[in-house]
Amino acid sequence: MHELSYATSILNSILEVLKEQESLGKKVTGVSEINLEIGDLTLISFEQLKFAFEVIAENTLCKNAVLNTEMIKPKISCLNCGFLGILEVTDELEAKCPKCGSMNVRIKGGKEFNIKNAIIEFDD
């Protein structure tokens, strides 16, 4: 379950930002939302990621944070017929041109894993 390591990475990154904010004299009361960008080729189960995050964030300022995700589709270019488009990720993990069926393709993107932003709550 590599989702646990991803969840841990998210939590550690956000807690580091909270620590920085507090070092600037701001009183952080919590995090309400964390927005992620996840590539389809990471094969991360978003439901498992959310569950793992909820468990490890339980006793932190992130305990009430809602995880949102934007899934990033990989792009494919066929070196055989010239097709350019989106690669639909399947369980087979085969990269074939949807137009001509060739496996002579290049794939760009789809492996992203980014924290896009987070909504941090402060005490006034």
Swiss-Prot record:
Domain of life: Archaea
Keywords: Metal-binding, Nickel, Zinc
UniProt: Zn(2+) binding residues: C78, C81, C97, C100
A Pfam family reported for this protein in Swiss-Prot or TrEMBL: HypA
Residues reported to bind Ni(2+): H2
Signal peptide: none
InterPro entries attached to this UniProt entry: HypA/HybF
Any one GO molecular-function label of the UniProt entry: nickel cation binding
GO biological process: protein maturation; protein modification process
UniProt record similarity statement: Belongs to the HypA/HybF family.
Function: Involved in the maturation of [NiFe] hydrogenases. Required for nickel insertion into the metal center of the hydrogenase.
HAMAP family, alphabetized: HypA_HybF
Protein name according to UniProt: Hydrogenase maturation factor HypA
Organism: Methanococcus vannielii (strain ATCC 35089 / DSM 1224 / JCM 13029 / OCM 148 / SB)
Gene designation: hypA
